[in-house]
Every structure is written in structure tokens, then in C-alpha cells.
Regions:
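Fe-S ferredoxin-like electron-transfer domains
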Residues: 48-207, 215-245, 249-251
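Short, structural beta-strand-to-alpha-helix junction motif
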Residues: 19-24, 65, 323
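Catalytic alpha/large subunits of respiratory electron-transfer oxidoreductases
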Residues: 91, 95, 148, 153, ...
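Short, contiguous acidic and Ser/Thr-rich linear segments
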Residues: 11-19
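A basic, amphipathic helix-loop patch mediating RNA/tRNA/ribosome contacts
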Residues: 21-55
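Short structural boundary motif marking the start of a folded domain
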Residues: 2-6
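Short strand-turn-strand beta-turns centered on an Asx-Gly dipeptide
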Residues: 8-11, 54-56, 258
């Protein structure tokens, strides 16, 4: 894509031709409100508050692409009226339980209601009873749901599970007279909102890989972790940046911490968060944090037994599912005490790398997952992406969905999740041990 120049509120902005106006504005520190849009997902036009004026015509910044010389105005009297009406509609029948809602203090509905100056309500419709649902690790409260569809988009475009969809809401239809009296976009958004809720894509059970990304992207308190629900207020927590210790991918995350209880000042991890516009977590990273709260790993007797075992051993056999830090410890032990390190997986991978380099004249270490995200053709050999490296799976799926890419997936075990990425992906299930042949 070629470089272009556009003007947003009089400010010259460099952009790539075809880049969404919303992303150009964000890159240049220009505020355009948006609830439904996620950077790594397809636009859904669910919220419509990203309305702007481009060359005199109203467009949606999340879906309209920048063109050279385009002049954009982010706020006019009509746009302000539309945005305010949209936020009023979102607030219709929304439960006034902010004091106990798990999202209170970091709720985008709260923030935008204040941002748009909504201090009175002009609209109403009879509410319907909506029963909360528990989907394993996830709690869904449809009464709090604003149907922004971020969870649906994340599950499809980021993760690849496609486990969520919009389902019929039921209840009274909107008064037809509202179409003539309300701002156009506010009415269209309300009409859609009034017909829909979020539900499992297949039956009544949520069939997914339990990554919890839908919880992370939810702007309100509709989707929360069942373990975190009603345990803490957001403003009581201290976010500690860290790297996930469950595998060598080292995903960036935040541990939200506070004291264990009123009579126990020891810090405790209450939940894990991530920068979902840039990186997604797997279920291990998001939900597997309680090992830090337990005391088993602090057993001095067990630790001494492990030390004695190391003293007697001359060989260490280990699995590939270890962190970079653990691998470094093994290397240091080998250098200092002369241990033999045995890992069958690593040996097979070494053989594969030798064959790959001889065949292609290239090394696999010349790229990272960010390059996968931006690729249009990907080949995966030897790894069961669903469990071996979920982040690689997310990148694979995202490239196929967002770049209209294609790919080949080689593995002995059939994987319905990977097969569901798209029609341009060919999955080849071969006999075990033929990975090097496929290269």
C-alpha cells in the first residue's frame, strides 16, 4: 500500500492507502469514540458512534478507508446529536448496579455516557427478563449486554473458535414512530440492539477452547470470569506487568493483585488481564494463575529433596513445555556440573531444522508471530497448534481471516478448530513421524 496524506480536524496525518480512518486517527492521537471496533478484527458497525464527516459525507471511521487528500471532521453538531442519542439508547433499561458490577470503574459504557454528556433519558421500552448464564469459566449476564459484538469478533477473527454469535432477544418491537423522531443512526443501532443478544454458536453449550478473550474485550460487565465475579472492585487492584510463565512464548500480561482478605495482608492474584488490541492469551495464561497463590511450591523439605536428586544425577531428561527461564537454568546446570540434557522433541526439531535449511536455504528464526499476522500464506508443520502454541494458532487464524490468506496445516491428529479457520486452509493428517518428509 502506498503512503498518503489526509487531514483530520485540520491536522495532516500520514497513512497507508486503504487504512481505516479510525486507525489513522488513533495513530495520530486524535480521539474518535468507538465501542464495537477491535484493531485485529473485521468492523461490525454495531455501535455507530465512530461517525465522522469525510469530504462532507458522513461515514463510519471504523469501516471507511483513507484516501489521499481526504479531509475529515470528527465532530459536528449532527454527529454530536447522533452520538448522544446512541448512548442514551445504550442506557435504556441498563441495570443501575454499577456499585456491584465487576466492570465498574473501567466500564466503557460509563465512560462514554459521561463523554457524550448524557444526563437525562428521552427513550423507553418495556424490559424483558433475561436469565444469566454460566458457560464453564465464563459468566454471561444478558441484562448488562449492549450487543457490541466484540466477543463474537474476537472469538472468530482473533482466536478462531467462532463459538459465539448473536441470537434473538425476544420482547417488544420498537415503536415505528421513533424512526421519524430519532436520529437516523441511533434508531438503526437501537433496532438491531433490541432484537439481539449473545449466545453459543452451537446449541446451549459454549464449545470453545476456554481462552477467555471474550471476557477481556467485553466493554461492560456482561462477560466476566466466574472466578473473579463479585470478589473485588477494579480500583482496589494493582496491575503488575509480567510475562506468562506457562510456556516459552512469554506472552505479556498483567496480574491484578490485592490483599487476600481483611485479616490477611498477603498479596493475592485475583485475575489476569492483557492488552487485547495487541496480544491474545490462551486459557493457561488467563486462568492458570492460582499456582502463585498456593503454598505447595514453597515446601522447603520437597525443595531439599530435589537438590539431593540433582546431586546424585548425571542426566536430566526434560520436556519441551518449559519456560525460557527454566531452559536457561538447565543450560547453566549443564555448564557447571556437566549434566547430559535429553529431550527427544528438541532432537527431532533439530533434525527437522537441518532438513528445512538444506531444502529452502533459509532459517525459521528470521520471523516472528507478528510476521505471521501480516502474511497471506502460511505453512504449519509438526505442531498441534491448539495446545502446543495457541498464540501461533491465533496468528494463523487472524492472517487467514483478516488478510484473506491461505495455508497448509500438517499434523497426524485431526483438529476441527484449525479446520474451521476458512476454506483457503488445507489440513493434511499424515502418519506420525512423517513431519520431515512433508518439508
Amino acid at each position: 500500500m502506498s503512503d498518503i496524506t489526509i487531514k483530520i480536524d485540520g491536522k495532516e496525518c500520514k497513512a497507508k492507502e486503504g487504512e481505516y480512518i479510525l486507525n489513522v486517527a488513533r495513530a495520530n492521537d486524535i480521539f474518535i469514540p468507538a465501542i464495537c471496533y477491535l484493531t485485529r478484527c473485521s468492523p461490525t458497525l454495531a455501535c455507530r458512534i465512530c461517525l465522522v464527516e469525510a469530504d462532507g459525507k458522513q461515514v463510519y471511521a471504523c469501516n471507511a478507508k483513507a484516501k489521499d487528500g481526504m479531509e475529515i471532521t470528527t465532530l459536528t453538531e449532527n454527529i454530536a446529536e447522533e452520538r448522544r442519542a446512541i448512548m442514551e439508547v445504550y442506557d435504556v433499561n441498563h441495570p443501575l448496579e454499577c456499585g456491584v458490577c465487576d466492570q465498574s470503574g473501567e466500564c466503557e459504557l460509563q465512560n462514554y455516557t459521561l463523554e457524550m454528556g448524557v444526563d437525562e433519558q428521552h427513550y423507553a421500552i418495556r424490559d424483558t427478563h433475561k436469565v444469566p448464564q454460566d458457560w464453564g469459566l465464563i459468566h454471561y449476564d444478558p441484562a448488562l449486554c449492549i450487543v457490541c459484538e466484540r466477543c463474537v469478533s474476537a472469538c472468530k477473527d482473533m482466536i478462531g473458535d467462532s463459538a459465539l454469535k448473536t441470537v434473538p432477544r425476544g420482547g417488544d418491537p420498537l415503536d415505528k414512530e421513533l424512526k421519524n423522531s430519532m436520529p437516523k443512526d441511533a434508531y438503526a443501532m437501537w433496532n438491531k440492539l433490541n432484537k439481539s443478544l449473545i449466545g453459543p454458536a452451537k446449541g446451549d453449550t459454549l464449545e470453545c477452547t476456554d481462552c477467555g478473550e471474550c471476557i477481556a474485550v467485553c466493554p461492560v460487565g456482561a462477560l466476566v470470569s466466574s472466578d473473579f465475579q463479585y470478589t473485588s472492585n477494579a480500583w482496589e487492584l494493582t496491575s503488575i506487568p509480567a510475562a506468562c510463565a506457562h510456556c516459552s512464548a512469554g506472552c505479556h500480561l498483567y496480574y491484578d493483585v490485592k490483599h487476600t482478605s481483611i485479616d490477611n495482608p498477603e498479596p493475592k492474584i485475583y485475575r489476569v488481564k492483557n492488552e487485547w488490541n495487541y496480544v491474545s492469551l490462551c486459557g493457561a495464561g488467563r486462568f492458570g494463575y492460582d499456582f502463585e497463590n498456593r503454598t505447595e511450591g514453597k515446601d522447603e523439605t520437597a525443595f531439599q529433596k530435589a537438590i539431593e536428586a540433582f546431586k546424585k544425577a548425571d542426566t536430566i531428561r526434560f520436556s519441551s513445555v518449559i519456560s525460557n527461564e527454566e531452559a536457561l537454568i538447565l543450560q547453566r546446570l549443564k555448564e557447571k556440573y556437566g549434566y547430559k540434557l535429553i529431550n527427544e522433541d528438541a532432537k527431532r526439531f533439530q533434525n527437522f531444522m537441518n532438513i528445512f535449511s538444506k531444502t529452502t536455504g533459509r532459517t525459521l528464526y528470521s520471523a516472528d508471530l507478528n510476521d505471521v499476522h501480516h502474511s497471506d500464506f502460511i505453512v504449519s508443520i509438526g505442531a498441534q497448534l491448539k495446545s502446543d502454541n495457541p498464540r501461533a494458532r491465533y496468528a494463523f487464524n487472524n492472517a487467514i481471516k483478516m488478510n484473506k490468506g491461505a495455508g497448509l496445516y500438517f499434523h497426524p491428529v485431526k483438529d476441527p478448530v484449525v479446520e474451521g479457520f476458512g476454506k483457503n486452509l488445507i489440513c493434511i493428517n499424515h502418519k506420525p513421524g512423517l513431519d520431515t518428509v512433508s518439508s
